Amino acid sequence: MDLTENTAVKTTAANTVPNTVLIEDIERTLKLPLLKELCGKTVLITGATGLIGQTLARVLLQYGAGEDPEKKIHVIACVRDREKADRLFEGFASGNLTYLVCDIASLHAKKADRKVDYMIHAASQTSSRAFVEQPVETIFTAVNGTRSALEFARQNEVQ
């Protein structure tokens, strides 16, 4: 599946239009030499159903989508809602994408189905209302989520 078909779309009341800035960023990212270093590796992405996490997961999956097994990048998408993840990653479902269903705060207690080489922590509260109405709790959640992600990385010897 071509990333630009599904990722970079902005919905308006009138219609759906491509987000050309995001499409250009994705195309530029797919050319980065760094991606070659991830070939054959497993990357766990927290917040994989959010804008940043989802886009990163799709880029990694798209990069490794060819026939060459040495070029594959396995993505473990850490998500809270499996059904949402299935919808967002429809068309990317392959042996290179698995889910770890949990809240970021409990990630440290989970076990991945394979060795995790790298982790991208993209989970975050995105509701402005939460920041305004419950600032302490919101920051507490962010700190504890990051602590849990770091503990997972330590326990699993993530690079």
How should each PLM-predicted stretch be described?
Residues 54, 98-141:
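NAD(P)H-binding glycine-rich loop region in Rossmannoid oxidoreductase-like domains
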